[in-house]
Amino acid sequence: MNINSPDPSFVYLLPVPVQAGRTGSLGAVVYALSDQATASLKPELICEYLPERILPSPSYLFAQGLSPHRLRHGLKARSFTKRIKEIVSNRIIVTWDAALLPLIDVNAVRCFLQPLIPLSRGIISLRTLAHAAFFFGQLESGPLKALEKSAELYDVFAGQEIRSPERRLKELIGIGRMLREKHGALFDYQLRGRKNKLGVLEYSYLNSAPISLVNDEGECGIMRVLRKEAAGFTVLFISCKQVDKPRLLNLNEYGGEIIAPLSVFTKERCMRLGFDLQGALLTMSKYDPSSLLKAYEAVSHNDNPLYAFFSSMNNADRAFYEYSCHHEELSDEISDLSEAFKKRVFLYTGDHERGKLSSEQYRLYESLSLQSLQTRYDAYMHETKLLVNRADENDPAEAALIQAIAAYPESL
């Protein structure tokens, strides 16, 4: 295997959130098609236009080395989303933490386009892969939660670049190259993509068979699929560390889990992990999860960030959304929309297609934007002051970034 040759089948990609939460605002993505040669790598940052009414999180901007002024010159929402679609379609997405990928689809449906992650061939979470390499391979230590700290831990990138999304992508590439070089079988197994993952899950579901799981939180154990739905699979999971405490999980297409046949738990690996495999299998065979399934059904919706968006639609909302997904312009049919959906359309139009607003609508949009800014302003400035106290006073790049963050609201 030549790890230095380009492989167009996958793409290194990091979402760049500018607000907290799985439904927060996405400010940019940084990506590179899979040229493994770090020295020649040229990451590309694509920013999305940030409307005036949305104040980003200063700590998120600072942590990623992103000036808010770059976002003011980004692509409008639908153009941004269509560009990401070109990047991820029919490719494996290689990222650090799969938990951030739903932001891409939340962003897509907010501008009335289809979710993008299902168009990919699958997800490789390098953080999860590093956990698996520690459990099943020869990696001496598991990863840390933060990409930057893990890059230091594995000594894969020693550049002196200032903090930036582009630097973070280079660190991701460095960890990816290390894992592919030293743990190629694991990496290549994940390159089989979503089709292989679904095949193993289907096998478990149809045969009530236990299989292995390394999840995105770095837990290793066995599981059995109990229920298959459009939103994902409900599984019974038993961790290596707690063989007497089974619990339910929901697995969907946003996860970077490593799912494999039970045979990966060889006798030697079980001894090294301190895993009582036979005890776990016995617990699984005797456990009746039916009492938990009904209660879990409502909770599991929290794992799907798009659930709230789609579940609240009426028929007119759905018709508007379907039309807008497949046309350059949004639908003109808005009279029968629900009030909540109508507000979404109004704010989107004000954010990205302001010329379509009447004078009265424009005044209303300006009023709503001002209210939004005033609501968030004090928290924004407080967060910025905390950054000043934490910053390295001897680092001019940090000082310049904080100054740009502090001055941003006054520029609006």
Predicted regions and their residues:
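Conserved DEDDh/DEDDy metal-dependent 3′-5′ exonuclease domain
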Residues: 59-136, 276, 284-291
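Signature of the SF2 helicase/ATPase Hel1-core->accessory helical subdomain module
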Residues: 30, 43-48
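Substrate-recognition/cap regions that form aromatic- and gly/pro-loop-enriched pockets
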Residues: 279-382, 386
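Short, flexible loop/turn elements at secondary-structure junctions
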Residues: 15-17, 51, 99, 128
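Entry/capping segment at the start of metal-dependent catalytic domains
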Residues: 1-40
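Acidic, Mg2+-coordinating catalytic module of metal-dependent nucleases/exonucleases
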Residues: 92-98, 107, 138-195
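Acidic two-metal-ion nuclease catalytic site recognized across multiple nuclease folds
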Residues: 177-278, 282, 376-412
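Active-site-proximal helix-loop-helix substrate-binding element of RNase H-like nuclease domains
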Residues: 48-72, 123-169
